[in-house]
Amino acid sequence: MTIILGIDPGSRVTGYGLIKESDRKIAYIDSGCIRTSNDVELSHKLLQIYDGICELMDHYSPTEVAIEQIFMHNNPNSALKLGHARGVAMVAAASHRAKICEYSAREIKQSVVGYGAAEKDQVSHMVVELLQLNRAPQKDAADALAIAICHSHMRNGLSKLIGSRGTKRRRMRL
């Protein structure tokens, strides 16, 4: 069994989603949001994110962490803040010796919905379906669960399927 933590980083709200994978089947463990205080400086917000991720790592002991890659914002200041939040989340996971993988928004949508330009509500719907949830989680938590699901799909990708079948190489006849 593998426990995967998906992280949707943000300087105000960082979503997290935990799933377990066993025999190529996934199941929901937990999800939620780490909300930072509005009235503190960026450095203290980053510490809150770090502490929140460390708490999740200590409590659930995931061995693999998946996080969304940065995409270019129209506002460079927002992109920098997102980069900081992403960085401290990665450091928190790395300090617990977890394997960390990064995925683009397009890869996540393609893996979960089957369409790389899917809308957020389509992703949320598929998260509910794939994890057999009674209702949709909070927006940032649903995104984090989608990231974890994407990682599960990618780690069990085509190359592993081909390798597990024990296919033999055949010599091509001319």
UniProtKB/Swiss-Prot annotation:
Q: Does the keyword Iron-sulfur apply?
A: no
Q: Which residues bind Mg(2+) 2?
A: E68
Q: What is its main location?
A: cytoplasm
Q: Where does Mg(2+) 1 bind?
A: D8, D140
Cofactor(s) in the UniProt record: Mg(2+)
> What PROSITE patterns does the record point to?
RUVC
The record's section on InterPro entries has: RNaseH-like_sf, RNaseH_sf, X-over_junc_endoDNase_Mg_BS, X-over_junc_endoDNase_RuvC
Catalytic site residues? D8, E68, D140
Q: How does it assemble?
A: Homodimer which binds Holliday junction (HJ) DNA. The HJ becomes 2-fold symmetrical on binding to RuvC with unstacked arms; it has a different conformation from HJ DNA in complex with RuvA. In the full resolvosome a probable DNA-RuvA(4)-RuvB(12)-RuvC(2) complex forms which resolves the HJ.
**HAMAP family xrefs:** RuvC
Q: What is this protein called?
A: Crossover junction endodeoxyribonuclease RuvC
User: Gene encoding this chain?
Assistant: ruvC
